[in-house]
């Protein structure tokens, strides 16, 4: 007979929502203050496929799904938001987190910008 281990539910009141928006997808990760991941989801995991993953609607649905799951399981009440990437769903994901009745303490843009680093790839020739 096999033994099934159930993950212990932790009561996490304060957390961090990381939103990584690229041109092709959006990834939302919710962690506690120490950085331990509570849930990680993407637009592809929320049944958006192909070019629909890069839309603001997909970002909104992905962010709201992640936050609602954490609120139900862990009782989170306060979050800070960290956004990175140049994608189209940045603002929609932030609004979706704010609409989930959470106290948002800060919104920070952590997009990395090169100070003239590597050479960009050449333009596509079709």
From Swiss-Prot:
One of its GO terms (cellular component) is ribonucleoprotein complex. The keyword Secreted does not apply. Keywords: Ribonucleoprotein, Ribosomal protein, RNA-binding, rRNA-binding. One of its GO terms (biological process) is translation. Transmembrane segments: none annotated. InterPro entries: Ribosomal_uS11, Ribosomal_uS11_bac-type, Ribosomal_uS11_sf. It comes from the Bacteria. It holds the Pfam family Ribosomal_S11. GO terms for molecular function: rRNA binding; structural constituent of ribosome. Located on the platform of the 30S subunit, it bridges several disparate RNA helices of the 16S rRNA. Forms part of the Shine-Dalgarno cleft in the 70S ribosome. NCBIfam families: PRK05309.1, uS11_bact. Belongs to the universal ribosomal protein uS11 family. Part of the 30S ribosomal subunit. Interacts with proteins S7 and S18. Binds to IF-3. This is Small ribosomal subunit protein uS11. The lineage of its organism: Bacteria, Pseudomonadati, Pseudomonadota, Alphaproteobacteria, Rickettsiales.
